[in-house]
């Protein structure tokens, strides 16, 4: 995998990079270290939120911005959801859908409101520093507190945010953004801190590279000297390709033309940060950066960040609620639909709590698990309000620990204590180093039965995903020729990413299907079927593993089994059943 990935990293064109990354992904799946399980969506849901009234794109953080959500006081009927989805497809790209959705809902007798009680969250943010994290639990909350340069709307169109306009140099190496004047930073009490300027994006990027929260790789090889600064080869940040030409002109210099550069701006690695506020919280840059310093408080709580987005956090009660209130100083305050955004906590111990809260209006929607589907059918709400949620690019995977060194809960060693002896652990570790053993496990898991514990048998394949990256995530922009196991293969423009992944897997003789060109009514898909689970293939892989491990001195048979531990949250009925 790593050799294939490095080759992709050196690609000269975007399409070549996509094709080589597809080959690398095939190698990673063949390794059996990570098993793709499901996407987000594909389950029954009920909601008061009109579909497609916030970003739906398959990348970045904009999908978690809710200021333009259209929310009603009543649950929206499934038939109306279907009508609105069809109308969205008709109006996509015109900029007219949101206004139409509001008008349609009012014509159908719904009442619009300016509050949104977000579907139950299950984990507190671990930091409020958007530039020092790669965790979705953090970004999903913090993204509502700042604006980026540009932002996707509900129709999938990039719209100006803090940047009013931009231009690209003829050689494609320089992007120049012109920032709007009048945007401000405020503290958690709404008091002005400073004006938003181009330097905020310079400071933000340097802090992101200093913190190395896990997403810095996104700009490596893209922005000039980003890789070198992150590795320490370059220590003078002025040599990195991000510059404030003046207070309202921001310039990015790229190592090579990148046609998708503006589509990356929704990722939190491009978030701004006010330099003086950061320094007032003990923050430093470069070699002096030390998040463990006694006086470093930036991002430790919601009071220790500055805000330039549609909301400020007015209340954060751990494992209870997070309340976002409209930022009165927000540059676009007159054009947001939601003035109070409230996140409600749910630990998952009560399988029907989310459904009951949605019916009662405590939250404005929820996905339905098997228990809540039964409840909805029993009380008559299912037929009227339940619809199948759309899937997105999120992929949830299962991970095999091939180098385990922890045998109890790291935070409380009296919990989740493994029954393995030292000999058991050594045998399991040796077995897990064998690729055929790992493949046997991956091919032996009935993912349909696994997912059915949450969504029921009728939807168990609806959200099932067979690859890490959805096969239809991108298509080649131009013809590309790549080497697949010594044979040159040419792919025309328009070829799906997933097709290249599957071709490499087939060439390697690994019996999994991660791209089916006949799926999704002939459009092709990586979703909606189980391309991994096969008892015969699993047994074939295990037989080879047993033979190879025996040659290495490890006997596996009925009297000498390999013991596997699965750690799960026993408070959750779904996790327990899985």
Regions found by a protein language model. Give the residues of each.
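Ligand-site clamp/hinge motif
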Residues: 298-302, 329-379, 392
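Aromatic- and charge-enriched surface segment that lines or borders ligand/interaction sites
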Residues: 164-219, 245, 251, 357, ...
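Detector for C-terminal structural segments
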Residues: 1-119, 124, 137-141, 442-506, ...
């Amino acid at each position: 995998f790593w050799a294939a990935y490095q080759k992709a990293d050196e690609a000269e064109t975007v399409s070549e990079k996509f094709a080589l990354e597809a080959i690398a992904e095939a190698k990673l799946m063949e390794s059996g270290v990570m098993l793709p399980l499901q996407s987000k969506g594909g389950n029954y849901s009920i909601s008061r939120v009109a579909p497609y009234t916030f970003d739906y794109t398959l990348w970045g953080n904009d999908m978690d911005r809710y200021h333009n959500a259209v929310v009603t006081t009543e649950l929206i009927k499934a038939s109306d959801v279907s009508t609105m989805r069809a109308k969205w497809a008709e109006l996509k790209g015109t900029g007219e859908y949101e206004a139409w959705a509001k008008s349609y809902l009012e014509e159908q007798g719904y009442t619009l409101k300016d509050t949104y009680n977000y579907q139950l969250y299950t984990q507190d943010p671990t930091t409020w520093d958007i530039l020092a994290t790669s965790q979705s639990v953090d970004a999903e909350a913090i993204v509502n507190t700042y604006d980026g340069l540009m932002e996707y709307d509900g129709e999938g169109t990039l719209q100006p945010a803090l940047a009013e306009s931009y231009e690209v140099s003829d050689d494609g190496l320089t992007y120049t953004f012109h920032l709007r004047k009048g945007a401000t930073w405020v503290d958690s009490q709404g008091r002005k801190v400073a004006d938003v300027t181009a330097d905020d994006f310079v400071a933000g990027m340097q802090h992101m590279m200093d913190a190395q929260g896990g997403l810095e790789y996104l700009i490596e090889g893209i922005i000039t000297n980003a890789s070198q600064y992150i590795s320490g080869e370059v220590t003078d940040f002025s040599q990195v390709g991000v510059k404030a030409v003046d207070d309202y002109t921001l310039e990015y210099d790229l190592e090579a033309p990148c046609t998708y550069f503006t589509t990356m701006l929704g990722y939190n690695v491009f978030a701004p940060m006010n330099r003086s506020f950061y320094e007032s919280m003990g923050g430093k840059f470069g070699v002096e950066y030390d998040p463990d310093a006694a006086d470093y408080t930036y991002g430790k709580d919601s009071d220790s960040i500055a805000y330039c987005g549609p909301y400020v956090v007015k209340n954060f009660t751990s494992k209870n609620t997070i309340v976002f209130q409209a930022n009165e100083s927000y540059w676009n305050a007159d054009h947001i639909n939601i003035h109070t955004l409230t996140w409600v906590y749910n630990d998952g111990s009560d399988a029907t709590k989310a459904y009951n809260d949605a019916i009662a209006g405590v939250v404005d929607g929820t996905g339905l698990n098997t228990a809540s589907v039964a409840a909805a059918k029993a009380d008559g709400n299912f037929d009227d309000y339940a619809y199948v949620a759309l899937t997105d690019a999120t992929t949830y995977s299962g991970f095999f620990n091939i180098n385990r060194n922890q045998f109890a809960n790291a935070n409380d060693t009296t919990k989740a204590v493994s029954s393995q002896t030292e000999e058991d652990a050594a045998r399991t570790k040796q077995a897990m180093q064998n690729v055929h053993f790992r493949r046997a496990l991956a091919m032996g898991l009935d993912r349909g039965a696994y997912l059915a514990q949450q969504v029921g048998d009728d939807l168990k394949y609806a959200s099932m995903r067979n690859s890490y990256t959805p096969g239809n995530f991108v298509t080649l922009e131009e013809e590309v020729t790549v080497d697949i196991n010594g044979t040159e293969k040419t792919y025309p423009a328009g070829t799906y990413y997933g097709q290249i992944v599957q071709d490499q897997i087939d060439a390697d003789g690994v019996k999994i299907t991660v791209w089916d060109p006949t799926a999704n009514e002939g459009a092709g898909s990586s979703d909606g079927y189980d391309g991994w689970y096969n008892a015969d293939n699993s047994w074939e892989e295990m037989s080879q593993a047993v033979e190879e491990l025996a040659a290495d001195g490890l006997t596996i048979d009925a009297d000498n089994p390999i013991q596997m531990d699965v750690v799960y949250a026993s408070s959750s009925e779904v996790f327990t059943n899985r």
